[in-house]
């Protein structure tokens, strides 16, 4: 008799509903099945809040303050790392996510830090249906935008972000350096990188092609999970932002303005139209 406990990969893949051909699962809506409760319960071990805070420093806080932002919509709240940090810094934050399991974990994390999250489960493609009001900034962090597999979905989500911003608002969006992965390179140059900093989990790609980056998350307690994501290229994301209507777009690599082959990109897209600005700025 075979015990399912001896085959955590099979069991957890089944729970995430990847089926017999996981590499063929390339659907935007599937992320809801991927973030099962067991996985979200381990997510903070993947991040390691203290290590990530040290890696980021005050990068996002400084960016928001430089642009005069006070009200922030976090559209990819996850377990609440950025929402809670911003609340602690005095920002007015609304926290949204498409995964109810993630939002539940974020709410508990905030409560444990004497903060109260205002949460909303929302689909980015219909953001204005669920989120009301305008914001100084929208943040979409944690490599979250890669859950959108169709270009139509990506354009619609960006348009929804644009619509909830005030006339001079900004969008801050990050993603992995998928260009390097698609060209045969590694996910991180060395160590754990500066986003997923947990020491008891191994993260790496199992399959990469132009339409899919399938990552494996192996925890020290035997838990193994996967995420299927769309590999966003650097230039493509910038072009898409511009075509949706954002004006000046400034990009960073691993939180630095001057970069070469970083692990992660961060794009800051400004909504405000100014006559004297070169919108081709990199």
Curated annotation (Swiss-Prot):
Protein name as it appears in the record: Glycine/sarcosine N-methyltransferase
pH-activity note: Optimum pH is around 8.2 and 8.0 for glycine and sarcosine, respectively.
E.C. numbers: 2.1.1.156
Domain of life: Bacteria
Subunit structure: Monomer.
InterPro entries recorded: Gly/Sar_N_MeTrfase (IPR014369), Methyltransf_25 (IPR041698), SAM-dependent_MTases_sf (IPR029063)
GO-annotated biological processes: glycine betaine biosynthetic process from glycine; methylation; one-carbon metabolic process; protein homotetramerization; regulation of gluconeogenesis; S-adenosylhomocysteine metabolic process; S-adenosylmethionine metabolic process; sarcosine metabolic process
Location of the region described as Disordered in the Swiss-Prot/TrEMBL record: 1-27
Alphabetical UniProt keywords: Methyltransferase, S-adenosyl-L-methionine, Transferase
CDD domains referenced in this protein's UniProt entry, alphabetically: AdoMet_MTases
Signal peptide: none
Record-level GO cellular component terms: cytosol
Biased composition (Polar residues): 1-23
Keyword Methyltransferase tagged: yes
């Amino acid at each position: 008799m075979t015990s399912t406990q001896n085959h955590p990969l099979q069991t957890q893949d089944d729970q995430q509903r990847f089926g017999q051909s996981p590499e063929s699962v390339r659907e935007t809506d599937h992320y809801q099945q991927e973030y099962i409760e067991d996985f979200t319960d381990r997510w903070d071990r993947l991040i390691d809040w203290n290590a990530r805070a040290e890696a980021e420093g005050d990068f996002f806080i400084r960016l928001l303050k430089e642009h005069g932002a006070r009200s922030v919509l976090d559209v990819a709240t996850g377990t609440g790392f950025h929402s809670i940090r911003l609340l602690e810094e005095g920002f007015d934050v609304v926290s949204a996510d498409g995964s109810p399991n993630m939002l539940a974990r974020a709410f508990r994390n905030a409560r444990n830090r004497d903060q109260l999250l205002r949460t909303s489960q929302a689909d980015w493609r219909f953001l204005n249906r669920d989120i009301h009001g305008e914001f100084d900034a929208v943040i979409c962090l944690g490599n979250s935008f890669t859950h959108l597999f169709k270009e139509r979905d990506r354009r619609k989500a960006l348009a929804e972000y644009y619509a909830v911003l005030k006339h001079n608002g900004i969008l801050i969006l990050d993603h992995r350096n998928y260009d390097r992965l698609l060209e045969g390179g590694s996910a991180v140059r060395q160590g754990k990188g500066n986003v997923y900093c947990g020491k008891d989990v191994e993260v790496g790609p199992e399959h990469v092609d132009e339409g899919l980056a399938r990552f494996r998350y192996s925890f020290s307690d035997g838990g193994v999970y996967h995420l299927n994501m769309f590999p966003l290229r650097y230039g493509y994301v910038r072009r898409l932002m511009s075509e949706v209507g954002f004006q000046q777009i400034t990009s960073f690599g691993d939180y630095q303005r001057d970069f070469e082959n970083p692990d992660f990109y961060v794009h800051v897209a400004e909504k405000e139209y100014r006559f004297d600005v070169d919108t081709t700025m990199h």
